[in-house]
Amino acid sequence: MAQHNRYISPFSTRYASDEMQYIFSDDNKFKTWRRLWIALAKAEKAQGLAITDEQIAELEAHKDDINYEDAIAREKLVRHDVMSHVYAYGLQCPKAKGIIHLGATSCYVGDNTDVIVMREALQLVRKKIIGVLANLAKFAEEYKAMPCLAYTHCQPAQLTTVGKRATLWMNELYMDLEEIDHQISQLALRGVKGTTGTQASFVELFNGDSAKIKAVEADVCAQMGFAKVVPVCGQTYSRKVDYNVLSAVAGLGQSAMKMATDIRLLANFKEMEEPFEKNQIGSSAMPYKRNPMRCERICALSRYLMVDVLNPAMTSGTQWFERTLDDSANKRIAMAEGFLAADAILNILLNVSDGLVVYPKVVRARVMAELPFMASENIMMKAVKKGGDRQELHERLREHAVAAAAVVKQEGKPNDMIARVEADPAFGLSREEIETELSPEAFTGRSAEQVTEFLRDVIQPVLDANAEDVGQHVELNV
């Protein structure tokens, strides 16, 4: 039932996927806590502590049916979330109550869960980036040879191709993918470290047997699916980990904003558009409007994501000695919402990249309006071959280009540079001779080949290795 009398995050109601929302949900968090308590009990039993199979079986029987009401009521009394859930779990598991959380500190479940959740979230981000790359690969291949204007300073420069421009977007997303893969590979559990990272409580439990303590930690690590634990820590793992992870995710915001901005500008030129639904309304006052609202939303969310990375940066710097609680409130907002923002951006990118619309005739017309300027050097070389003076012709072309530009800008008329060159006896060229130099395909360089090589050498290996992530389709809520 909808709740209209309280604030609910737009990430939950409008933007983020159910999958990402579940990853950062209380249910996923507290179920992971219970998995960690079970893993600890098993590891401690294996090293000789008095823990029975019956106790472990009882813990496993209730690992998913969390008695939230009991935990909530207890937290109101003791003001401690971890001990409230230890208590609630103990109510369900009376035989195992005495060995839950044995030797551990709150950060055993809190920090280890945060690392596990970050890995799950990174893997979902990774999956969706690959889906976007797959969509753009098809687009780039289809349009790899279609000439279009290239821009520097947002002014027409030379020509590129529609597909080649798409590879620029893809290359940045590929860079994000590499960084996210790096962060996944570097993630390590906090492990079993005790209250200030010294493992003092486990020294007491195992009578100073370091080998057993290290074995417990390695066992827990393996049970949770990790290859390593942090080598040293205070009460928490270093908050630089959060900064590194969110920085990688925020890189996606940069790439997405650049791509979405390009599409918005191209929509203004009427060369390309994002998908537009049959019943979509662009403006309440202007029925003809086709606003690039999805790409605008990508840009809006990307700004949020890029700024959000400042939170873990400052949090990392304010951790005094072994730990303060400066991190907790900020971290639970910044990390979750950073990933939710990235997820929302990727949902829109998946939708947009799956339905980009190109208008070839507009693209061609805009090319042909500028091509006479771009072809001036070729025209000059042809006239030189017929006996013209290179320096004189260069000056004549400059004068014609300035005059033709004035006609376009001041009079709103078509570019008449070709007619000016044809009428200038210094060139001695017929219209047919001039127009042979006006094939757009001759001005795109190796664009089509570059697309082929990029897709073959960089993108296709990624798609082949992650075939299950190709072909994703997203329906947006709004």
Model feature map: region roles:
Residues 21-25, 70-72, 280-300, 322-337, ...:
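Short beta-alpha connecting loops at secondary-structure transitions
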